[in-house]
């Protein structure tokens, strides 16, 4: 867990944007580095581990996207999971946290983070959103397969992502 925390903070330290110090302060004060996810990566530190796995996937499949946007989308896409559910999706809560920290997002970063779980046309028109969804599917599917031997779950996630890509 500490190694992933150090790697994430190292990546974020290389991003020179307004509000980054406030975001890092939020990450350290919240349960971002210690909590697990609800449906996958349930272990302590699972949320940060999942976000780092998504970052690693996205970096390996960058498709000409900026390294900074990849880091922002991957490492912050599930930031909203650090707050209680409020009837809105965690993508929207992630955007709210970043706004509260004064952290500006590009339109593509906003779309990718806010809609990474929805099926909409921007999956086809926003390469960052498409890559984030693929990375999220990859990390989630691999975790479920490894920890629960849910081959059908991993295959199902891959099949869904593949169907989106072929659309």
Where do the language-model regions lie?
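Metal-dependent phosphohydrolase cores
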Residues: 1-167
């Amino acid at each position: 867990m500490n190694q992933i925390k150090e790697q994430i903070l190292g990546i974020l330290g290389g991003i020179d944007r307004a509000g980054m110090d406030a975001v890092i302060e939020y990450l350290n004060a919240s349960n971002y580095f210690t909590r697990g996810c609800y449906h996958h990566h349930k272990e302590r530190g699972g949320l940060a581990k999942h976000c780092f796995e998504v970052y690693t996937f996205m970096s390996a499949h960058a498709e000409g996207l900026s390294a900074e946007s990849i880091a922002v989308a991957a490492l912050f896409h599930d930031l909203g999971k650090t707050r209680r559910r409020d009837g809105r999706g965690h993508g929207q809560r992630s955007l709210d946290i970043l706004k509260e920290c004064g952290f500006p997002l590009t339109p593509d970063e906003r779309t990718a983070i806010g809609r990474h779980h929805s099926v909409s046309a921007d999956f086809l028109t926003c390469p960052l959103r498409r890559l984030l969804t693929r990375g999220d599917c990859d990390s989630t599917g691999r975790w479920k397969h490894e920890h629960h031997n849910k081959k059908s779950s991993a295959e199902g996630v891959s099949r869904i992502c593949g169907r989106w890509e072929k659309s």
